[in-house]
Curated annotation (Swiss-Prot):
Subcellular location: Peroxisome
Protein name from the UniProt record: Uricase
Organism the protein comes from: Cyberlindnera jadinii
Domain of life of the source: Eukaryota
SUPFAM superfamilies for this protein: Tetrahydrobiopterin biosynthesis enzymes-like (SSF55620)
Job description of the protein: Catalyzes the oxidation of uric acid to 5-hydroxyisourate, which is further processed to form (S)-allantoin.
Catalysis performed (reactions): urate + O2 + H2O = 5-hydroxyisourate + H2O2
Residues noted as binding urate in the record, renumbered to the chain: T60, D61, F162, R179, V234, Q235, N261
GO cellular component, one term: peroxisome
UniProt keywords, alphabetically: Oxidoreductase, Peroxisome, Purine metabolism
Family listed: Belongs to the uricase family.
Principal EC category: oxidoreductase
GO BP annotations listed: purine nucleobase catabolic process; urate catabolic process
Amino acid sequence: MSTTLSSSTYGKDNVKFLKVKKDPQNPKKQEVMEATVTCLLEGGFDTSYTEADNSSIVPTDTVKNTILVLAKTTEIWPIERFAAKLATHFVEKYSHVSGVSVKIVQDRWVKYAVDGKPHDHSFIHEGGEKRITDLYYKRSGDYKLSSAIKDLTVLKSTGSMFYGYNKCDFTTLQPTTDRILSTDVDATWVWDNKKIGSVYDIAKAADKGIFDNVYNQAREITLTTFALENSPSVQATMFNMATQILEKACSVYSVSYALPNKHYFLIDLKWKGLENDNELFYPSPHPNGLIKCTVVRKEKTKL
């Protein structure tokens, strides 16, 4: 049988570091970034697969060392800047590398208050919430950059409804005008290259605070809408969230949400003569709903 290699990529996964940034005016005033990096290369590596010829391979250990050295010697805030630095480095250094994929997952460490003000160098790790960026960059100059919030777990004990849905002979779900709504937020926004510029302009956008500002806006919109909207459905609420982000962030091309609907079932205590007025629930580990959507701006109609 005749075969051919149709695609390949390789690199280093789970490269972890924590970097401390000290204020030049007050070294005790510090910021920290804990991150996990994946960096994958593609290009002229076919013979390493098809002919067992390793001469073209940049060892994955070299990829790991490069990530750590650049984390030490360059500015890494925000993570979109560092992703662009890594991607351009590998394309510039190795002529046979035609494309680079970089994913950076940043843990959420937040300063906590002591005597009413944030402490200079003490932090709380806020659960499993992550800030993420993904960059795919090609030697031709084409790239796709996205940013995300993941595993931001939220719950509200009222202010959510679900009724008026399709019913058939398989339907057992009862309509409700008052229920618990809980989810693990996974929100991703894709940047508009026309607004950002080339991959080398990502650093300029970072200097202007664009990436941090949109991250903060997306997080605030998500939390505020979740809290204040009397949600008719997860579908309607996530569409409203995405629309608001697009209205605020002119440099964003699209916004996607993936929201699991984590179920809490009312516990029946009638056997004990007790009415359960939406007070005691069972947190169901599985199964759960999963709702996804992507929202983009409407193209302007040409006259």
